[in-house]
Amino acid sequence: MDAEPKRKFGVVVVGVGRAGSVRLRDLKDPRSAAFLNLIGFVSRRELGSLDEVRQISLEDALRSQEIDVAYICSESSSHEDYIRQFLQAGKHVLVEYPMTLSFAAAQELWELAAQKGRVLHEEHVELLMEEFEFLRREVLGKELLKGSLRFTASPLEEERFGFPAFSGISRLTWLVSLFGELSLISATLEERKEDQYMKMTVQLETQNKGLLSWIEEKGPGLKRNRYVNFQFTSGSLEEVPSVGVNKNIFLKDQDIFVQKLLDQVSAEDLAAEKKRIMHCLGLASDIQKLCHQKK
């Protein structure tokens, strides 16, 4: 990313919640200015402007010749529709995970991006975290016997953020990135809607027959936390040390996206990333089906 492009890519941010606000901030960073030009944001709320960034309508964003790129930072349930509209309009798309709440829809959108000759990038900042880098180093070259990854947090609205296997897909992405493609053995969902409590328990198997449990547990009073326990043929790992603040992970993700815009990522790397994303979305879809069958 050394040479500046002849023309900067005009960007619109769709959705200005937590992720969208971070994207707006990062687009003003000097590192972004060489390649990206923030044109405005789209929001269902009437905000007028935010920190001197103007609000524009969805229709204007889709039509604008100034806008080359859309950052989709809205709630997960709306991702598919926004991605489709912006790709159809000939724009490149960066979307916060999960890109869709169904495997089939994701396949359609990849095909549309290829047909339009546009970049479709699903954000995965969890792979840029210091905790993941620690785990990756610890796991490298070791054979897993069994392990577990449990995540706890406060309740999340399924209607807006999807079934737990989709809203929690960053944890599944960790497991797949650490241990390779996984097979689904079983999945159960315990729900107490009156208490806003849910617990999803998934059993997975590595290609070397190592067993993995993935648990997503959400309810009032549950603090946001990850618990890991991996047993290897050569020792075990029972916690991830506190590594402090993960700095600039959204900016680093944006750097990867810009490399794709500039055609600086190899076809092999793009194919491997897409394969991992689709494997995780496929597992999430299968987990959802299995849990619904048992209801």
Curated annotation (Swiss-Prot):
Pathway: Porphyrin-containing compound metabolism; protoheme degradation. It catalyses: (4Z,15Z)-bilirubin IXalpha + NAD(+) = biliverdin IXalpha + NADH + H(+); (4Z,15Z)-bilirubin IXalpha + NADP(+) = biliverdin IXalpha + NADPH + H(+). Its EC number is 1.3.1.24. The modification Phosphothreonine is found at T173. The keyword Ligase does not apply. Zn(2+) binds at H279, C280, C291, H292. Its cofactor is Zn(2+). Changing C291A: Reduced activity. This is Biliverdin reductase A. It comes from Rattus norvegicus. The lineage of its organism: Eukaryota, Metazoa, Chordata, Craniata, Vertebrata.
